[in-house]
Amino acid sequence: MSFHLWMANLDAYMQETFGVGRRDIADWTYHDAYDDGLTFREAAHQAIANELGS
């Protein structure tokens, strides 16, 4: 899956699951997560946890 498609899936998943998109929270290292092989779901949960300080 391309990074562009991965990000689109991540953003849709965040909207459906958390009610916010990636542009609604602080910047996070999405490309590093993609390069490390995380799924877009795993990355979304980590980005939200980072936003909440967890």
From Swiss-Prot:
Protein name: Gene 87 protein
Upper classification of the organism: Viruses, Duplodnaviria, Heunggongvirae, Uroviricota, Caudoviricetes
Domain of life where this protein originates: Viruses
Gene name of this polypeptide: 87
